[in-house]
Amino acid sequence: MNAKILFKIANSFLLYDLSTKSQFNAVIRKKLKQEDRIITVGDNVEFVKDQYEYVIEKIDERKNLLIRPKVANIDTLIIVNSVKEPDFSSYGLNKFLAFYEARNINNVIIYFSKMDLLNKQESKNMNQIISQYEQNGYIVLNSLDKEKNKEKILNMIKNNVVCFAGQSGVGKSTLINFLIPDLELRTQEISQALNRGKHTTTSSLMIPFNEGFVIDTPGFGSLDLNMTQLELANSFTDFRNNSVHCKFKNCLHTNEQNCFIKKMVDENKIYKQRYLDYLKMFSEIKK
């Protein structure tokens, strides 16, 4: 029988049976534990019911795995990024994009929150930044178009696993509560299934919703890229998609001659600040 991992606490796992749509606790087979197999939220598993309990027997192969937040098998990742309180940081956003896209997340969406806190000039500047990301191929949503974007996100969730991630205080929980009005009721049901108190977002939680799944993740402070310089270059999607035109096969887009990416930056076809952020990350990896 097949299930998804909704939540993990110690050595107990909350499973969602894909055929019956029921939720129940399970433990991991001793053999898997001895093999030091790590199970995380989003994992697809096979289970059986023995005389006393449900037992996880196998972890299916993952299509992707994130360490921060710790989740697996994501179809779409929505990065919630505040434009005010805390203020927008292009470096922070570009670092998140590089980190996630290096981990086989094919569909990464940017959501700018707290747009209503900007003054007129700040809004104008932010809209120019949004246009740059859209020009570079990203889907960008924002908190001013709540109802329209709600429909877009609900359509993304259907038959998919959508994960929301972002730093602490960016408004991620506000967005998820807007999308799922009965979220508290749903999390209460999960807490009851686990025989524990009210759930708070200190660990990742997968919620069945709209014929798909939403993953709510804890906020975090910063990320370590933990990759090589070439991996960094390839994790910038707009760079990777155009690097075929560079003179050198493994061009790092720094000091190389006839670098097509630098040419695109000079022609304002790639957001210049994004390129400067790339150079900063590149130098940090070099150190």
From Swiss-Prot:
Annotated localization: Cytoplasm
Residues annotated as binding Zn(2+): C246, C251, H253, C259
Positions of the CP-type G domain: 63-223
Enzyme class: hydrolase
Coiled coil: none
Gene Ontology CC annotation, any one: cytoplasm
Any one Gene Ontology molecular-function term assigned to this protein's record: metal ion binding
Keyword terms: Cytoplasm, GTP-binding, Hydrolase, Metal-binding, Nucleotide-binding, Ribosome biogenesis, RNA-binding, rRNA-binding, Zinc
EC numbers for this chain: 3.6.1.-
Binding site residues for GTP: S113, K114, M115, D116, G166, Q167, S168, G169, V170, G171, K172, S173, T174
InterPro entries linked to this entry: G_CP_dom, P-loop_NTPase, Ribosome_biogen_GTPase_RsgA, RsgA_GTPase_dom
Record GO biological process: ribosomal small subunit biogenesis
Keyword Membrane included in the entry's annotation: no
Self-association and partners: Monomer. Associates with 30S ribosomal subunit, binds 16S rRNA.
Function description: One of several proteins that assist in the late maturation steps of the functional core of the 30S ribosomal subunit. Helps release RbfA from mature subunits. May play a role in the assembly of ribosomal proteins into the subunit. Circularly permuted GTPase that catalyzes slow GTP hydrolysis, GTPase activity is stimulated by the 30S ribosomal subunit.
Similarity annotation: Belongs to the TRAFAC class YlqF/YawG GTPase family. RsgA subfamily.
Protein name, per record: Small ribosomal subunit biogenesis GTPase RsgA
Lineage: Bacteria, Bacillati, Mycoplasmatota, Mycoplasmoidales, Mycoplasmoidaceae
